Amino acid sequence: FSLKAPRFAVNRKVLAEGGESVERFVQSGIAELGDRLGPILWQFAATKQFDPDDFGAFLELLPAKAEGLRLRHVVEPRHESFACPKAVALCRKAGVAIVCAEAEDYPQIADVTADFLYARLQKGDEAISTGYPAAALDAWAKRAKEWAEGGQPDDLRRADPQVQPVRQERDVFVYFIRSGKPRAPHAAMALQERLDAA
C-alpha cells in the first residue's frame, strides 16, 4: 500500500519546520503494514517554490526507518522551480524519489533519484474504456519496463539529463488519477496486461 502524507506536514511556508508533523505521521502505526508498505508520498502545494536550503532540510527530516521497517519516500513538487539540477541532486543524495507526473498543470521531472520509480498519470479520458488510448498505454508500459530494468526512458522530460542513474533493477509504481478518474482502474489493468505480456 502506498500512503499519502498529511498536508499539514508539507503545506507550510518553511518545510524544515515540519519535523514534528513528519514524526507524528511516521509513528502513527504505518509500520503495522510491514512488507505491504509501499512508498510514502509527500505532495507539495502547487505554489511552493524551490528553496534549496529549506528543501534539503526537509529531506533530512524523512526517516529511513519506522520501527525497524525501511521507508521509501517520494516527493511531488508541483512548481516549475523544482525542475532543476539542484533539486534532483538533493533528492538523489537523500535517496528520495521524485514523482514523474504526466499532468497539464505540473512539471514533469522524470529523473531517477532513488531505487524505485513513482509515476502519477493524470491525463485519463473518461470517454475511453481503458482510460488512456492504446498507444499511450503501450508507451507507459515500455517506460515502466525500462525503469524496472534499471534504464532511463529518453522520451520524458528530465531536469538534469546529464546525470545517468545507477543501472539497477527497481520497483516501479504507476498510478492513474485525476482526469478520467472513473476509468482509472481500467487503465491500471490495461497497463498491467501489457507488462505481463512483455
Where are these regions (language model features)?
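Residues lining hydrophobic/aromatic ligand-binding pockets adjacent to catalytic sites
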Residues: 2-198
